């Protein structure tokens, strides 16, 4: 009898899988800051996917924290095998397509090898990451494969091997012991201690093989993915009701560059411009790169382990920003601050707000899921200013401060939110999967947004710093850079809307001018409407409302900038005004401190060293002198 290619006594079964060199984004690490409560509850979904067929073997959802939402997952071995094996063997059959194939599959042991961390020589996807013995970390076999570092353990369920004929109850309902779908190979997946501590930012892959005494062990692969969602719904807050009808941005039209000006003919007088050209404003590409760079700086400060190797991608379709409702302590002012105006109410709508935070005013039932605490304003004339790094998302628009008088007289409501750009985070496994050879099914990438990774960081950091004196750790240059990038992008949005309003006004003037010309041409017939025998249409100019909203928007952006600058100390402002100052100080601070210590303690240490050497030399000299001379014995005189 021929020996099995994948039998237990053999060691190296195949040549090692050649390494695949992939260029990732290697990023330096920063300082870690705890940014989320460990008691926060999420909607966690675990999904087991057969990578050979793309079918879902198990999808389990539960409510829990990030430290205890690790349930047992139950599914069938045939959900991972499918109807056919890649390399069918005569005694295995085609797979789980027939009752006989399902029954024969149940007779064999199986072992599992990890694909998320592949040891040297364990092969690739084609071998199920089991290129040699010792790569298996779990399974159901006579040698009891196990591991102390793998993330899961996969064993057979409670059904004994000799129970059930593996018939499908929907086809053969009269046969005793038939099960739905003919499932007779139950498996139980449990998380190990290492798996409960691991980062599940992306899908993890394993290979499973049936152990046979002869022939080749058949292979299948499966992935395990965790999806985390906030319990609260994603609802819009703002005055714009047409949010769900947004379309992705159209492709940009190619702009023809103007030809360079021809040099003037000889003898012609050259014209010198009187004014200098205006300073170049940052373009769209620069602003988008600033957003991504600011997102990286903030993420690197809070979670340096996630930025060792990753992809940060800016979402190219609306919504471009999302809000995270937070709890915070606002400031109460009896008079209007200089950076806050009660009358200005611009019309920026935040289309996605998640989480639960502080609400003020009359909150409708559709938005009460966003409220952890709802406050009613007392009567009086005072102003509520949002903390640094946050803003009020109201049904009238985004604003840095509120008027209690306006809230008491109206049914308006506001939610305290943090504003985050829509930047998605992709782990290294997503990049590697793009270069792997696809056999049948391409894995769906799992992405996390910046709001999910950093949501609540501003208020959480401030709350933690009140008792520990570490509030300054949150107000760092990284978060200020992200805040400045968001403000610059909002200013460009305001400019774009203003330019659109001007274009619409110009177009309406052209249309009205054409209308007057046509009325003159058809004057004998009584005008254009009489000639067409239609009702006359008149132009209603609403661009004034847009112009007023844009003026208020510019005013509010200026106020937010003043509020941001007023919250900074003189020391932080010094670093912001001189960006090179940070690099200079960090470069020369170490050598300066070492030089200062040498100047302070160097003379004392040198004197001690010289005195010690002198003492040792004196002792040595004394020893040398004593060795050259010896004491004479006293002479005894005889009496005469």
From Swiss-Prot:
Residues 446-466 are annotated as: Fusion peptide. Glycans are attached at residues 43, 58, 300, 332, 339, 372, 408. Residues 606-640 are cytoplasmic. Residues 512-528 are annotated as: Immunosuppression. Keywords: Cleavage on pair of basic residues, Coiled coil, Disulfide bond, Fusion of virus membrane with host cell membrane, Fusion of virus membrane with host membrane, Glycoprotein, Host cell membrane, Host membrane, Host-virus interaction, Lipoprotein, Membrane, Palmitate, Signal, Transmembrane, Transmembrane helix, Viral attachment to host cell, Viral envelope protein, Viral penetration into host cytoplasm, Virion, Virus entry into host cell. InterPro entries: FMuLV_rcpt-bd, TLV/ENV_coat_polyprotein. A motif (CXXC) lies at residues 310-313. Specific enzymatic cleavages in vivo yield mature proteins. Envelope glycoproteins are synthesized as an inactive precursor that is N-glycosylated and processed likely by host cell furin or by a furin-like protease in the Golgi to yield the mature SU and TM proteins. The cleavage site between SU and TM requires the minimal sequence [KR]-X-[KR]-R. The R-peptide is released from the C-terminus of the cytoplasmic tail of the TM protein upon particle formation as a result of proteolytic cleavage by the viral protease. Cleavage of this peptide is required for TM to become fusogenic. A lipid is attached at residue 604 (S-palmitoyl cysteine). A motif (YXXL motif) lies at residues 629-632. Residues 1-32 form the signal peptide. Residues 477-511 form a coiled coil. Residues 259-284 are annotated as: Disordered. This is Envelope glycoprotein. The lineage of its organism: Viruses, Riboviria, Pararnavirae, Artverviricota, Revtraviricetes. The gene is env.
């Amino acid at each position: 009898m021929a020996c099995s290619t994948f039998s237990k006594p053999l060691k190296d079964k195949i040549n090692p899988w050649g390494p695949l060199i992939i260029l990732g984004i290697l990023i330096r690490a920063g300082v870690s800051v705890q940014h989320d409560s460990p008691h926060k509850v999420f909607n966690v979904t675990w999904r087991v996917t057969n990578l050979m067929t793309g079918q879902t073997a198990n999808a389990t959802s539960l409510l829990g924290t990030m430290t205890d939402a690790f349930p047992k997952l139950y599914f069938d071995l045939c959900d991972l095998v499918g109807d056919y094996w890649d390399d069918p063997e005569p005694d295995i059959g085609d797979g789980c397509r027939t009752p006989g194939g399902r029954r024969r599959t149940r007779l064999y042991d199986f072992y599992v090898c990890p694909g998320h961390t592949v040891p040297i020589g364990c092969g690739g996807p084609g071998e199920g990451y089991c290129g040699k013995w010792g790569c298996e970390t779990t399974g159901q076999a006579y040698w009891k494969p196990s591991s102390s570092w793998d993330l899961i353990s996969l064993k057979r369920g409670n059904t004994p091997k000799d129970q059930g004929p593996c018939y499908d109850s929907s086809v053969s309902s009269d046969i005793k012991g038939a099960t739905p779908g003919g499932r007779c190979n139950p498996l139980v997946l449990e998380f190990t201690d290492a798996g409960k501590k691991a980062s599940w930012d992306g899908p993890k892959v394993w290979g499973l093989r049936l152990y046979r005494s002869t022939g080749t062990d058949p292979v299948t692969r499966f992935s395990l993915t965790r999806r985390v969602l906030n319990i609260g719904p994603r609802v819009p807050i703002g005055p714009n009701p047409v949010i769900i009808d947004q379309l992705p941005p159209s492709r940009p039209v190619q702009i023809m560059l103007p030809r360079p000006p021809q040099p003037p003919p000889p003898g012609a007088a050259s014209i010198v411009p009187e004014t200098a050209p205006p300073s170049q404003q940052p373009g769209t590409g620069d602003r988008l790169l600033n957003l991504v760079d600011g997102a990286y700086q903030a993420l690197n400060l809070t979670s340096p382990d996630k930025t060792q190797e990753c992809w940060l991608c800016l979402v190219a379709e609306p919504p471009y920003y999302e809000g995270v409702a937070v709890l915070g302590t606002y400031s109460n002012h009896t008079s209007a601050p200089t950076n806050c105006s009660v009358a200005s109410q611009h019309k920026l709508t935040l289309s996605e707000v998640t989480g639960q935070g502080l609400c003020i005013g009359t909150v409708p039932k559709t938005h009460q899921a966003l409220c952890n605490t709802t406050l009613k304003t007392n009567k009086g004339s005072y102003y509520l200013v949002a903390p640094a790094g946050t803003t009020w998302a109201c049904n009238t628009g985004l604003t840095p401060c509120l008027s209690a008088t306006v809230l008491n007289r109206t049914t308006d409501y506001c939610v305290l939110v943090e504003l985050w750009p829509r930047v998605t985070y992709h782990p290294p496994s997503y990049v590697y999967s793009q270069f792997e050879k696809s056999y049948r099914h391409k894995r769906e990438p799992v992405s996390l947004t910046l709001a999910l990774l950093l949501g609540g960081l501003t208020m959480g950091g401030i709350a933690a710093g009140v008792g520990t004196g570490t509030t300054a750790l949150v107000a760092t240059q990284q978060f200020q850079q992200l805040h400045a990038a968001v403000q610059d992008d909002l200013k460009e949005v305001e400019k774009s809307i203003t330019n659109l309003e001007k274009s619409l006004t110009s177009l309406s003037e052209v249309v009205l001018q054409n209308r007057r010309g046509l009325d003159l041409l058809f004057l004998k017939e009584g005008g254009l409407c009489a000639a067409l025998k239609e009702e006359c249409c008149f132009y209603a100019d609403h661009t004034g409302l847009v112009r007023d909203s844009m003026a208020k928007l510019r005013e509010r952006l200026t106020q937010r900038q003043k509020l941001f600058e007023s919250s900074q100390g003189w020391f932080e402002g010094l670093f912001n005004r001189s960006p090179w100052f940070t690099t200079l100080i960090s470069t020369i601070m170490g050598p300066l401190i070492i030089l200062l210590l040498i100047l302070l303690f160097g003379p004392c240490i040198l004197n001690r060293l010289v005195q010690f050497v002198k003492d040792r030399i004196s002792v040595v000299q004394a020893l040398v002198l004593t060795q050259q001379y010896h004491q004479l014995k006293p002479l005894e005189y005889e009496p005469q």
